[in-house]
């Protein structure tokens, strides 16, 4: 109550708990956390009705912990009338895994939401990185840097847009490298270059939706009257025929080449523009 009173209209969203699927952060029951979520929501909404109440986040990469916590937490929230405005997950994959596994985790979260008959609320990925050590000793920390980091950041952004993740928060932008992370987000890092590419391609644009043909996902964008299509293969490679008026294919380094017909794509998004 004191926090909301002091910070009303300065804090726009309150996530109720961090990684509650892990006993190191929460050792009560899912039902008890749901009750606390309801109490916190009532306090927040009474003092700042415009604030967004975000459910406690769950991790996914430890499937046992996820399965023990998330369905029961959702059921308890439902019994309390769904006192949240958004759901949250931390979609870190195992250290050796890739953007593919992160996308699969989105499907797991959404499947549990559907099974719980949850309302159609935004889903946020409130903490994400790649290459973090774990789970277990067979998954040591990996280093993802340079062009690979740039590509994964761009791919993650478009996976989120395509799969319905309303917000994606990267952990963590730092002035100097942070040893915990597999992917550094310093100002000159490949990952931050990827964020700048996403900004150039879609921030301030009108998102016009995606088409998934089973092999390729293609998403249409209009930015200040300039149309483009961002497309990528779902499984390593796929062939895509861009609209005839889009004659340039640009990679995540913003290096462009002329196209006159179908293009062989990889899982890294390519931008087609005039």
Please place each PLM-identified region on the residue numbering:
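Short acidic/polar active-site loop segments enriched in Thr and Asp
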Residues: 9-12, 85, 166-167
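Conserved beta-strand positions
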Residues: 16-22, 55-56, 89, 125-128, ...
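Aromatic/acidic polysaccharide-binding cleft in carbohydrate-active enzymes
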Residues: 129-200, 210-215
């Amino acid at each position: 109550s004191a926090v909301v009173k002091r910070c009303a209209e300065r804090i726009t969203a309150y996530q109720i708990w961090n990684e509650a699927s892990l006993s190191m952060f929460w050792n009560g029951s899912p039902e008890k956390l749901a009750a606390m979520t309801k109490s916190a929501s009532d306090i927040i909404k009474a003092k700042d009705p415009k604030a967004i109440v975000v459910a406690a986040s769950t991790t996914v990469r430890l499937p046992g912990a996820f399965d023990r916590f998330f369905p029961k937490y959702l059921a308890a929230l439902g019994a309390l009338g769904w006192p949240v405005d958004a759901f949250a997950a931390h979609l870190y994959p195992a250290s050796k895994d890739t953007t593919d596994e992160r996308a699969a985790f989105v499907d797991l979260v959404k499947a549990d939401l559907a099974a719980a008959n949850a309302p159609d609320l935004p889903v946020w990925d409130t903490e994400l990185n790649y290459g973090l050590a774990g789970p277990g000793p067979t998954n040591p920390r990996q280093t993802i840097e340079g062009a690979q980091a740039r590509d994964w950041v761009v791919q993650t952004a478009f996976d989120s847009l395509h799969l319905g993740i309303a917000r994606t928060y990267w952990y963590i932008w730092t002035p100097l490298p942070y040893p915990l992370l597999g992917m550094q987000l310093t100002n000159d890092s490949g990952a931050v270059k990827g964020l700048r590419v996403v900004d150039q391609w879609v921030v301030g644009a009108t998102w016009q939706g995606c088409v998934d043909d089973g092999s390729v996902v293609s998403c249409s964008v209009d930015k200040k009257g300039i149309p483009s299509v961002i497309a990528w293969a779902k499984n390593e490679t796929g062939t895509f025929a861009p609209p005839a008026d889009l004659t340039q294919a640009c990679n995540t380094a913003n290096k462009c080449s002329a196209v006159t017909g179908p293009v062989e794509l990889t899982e890294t998004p390519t931008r087609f523009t005039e």
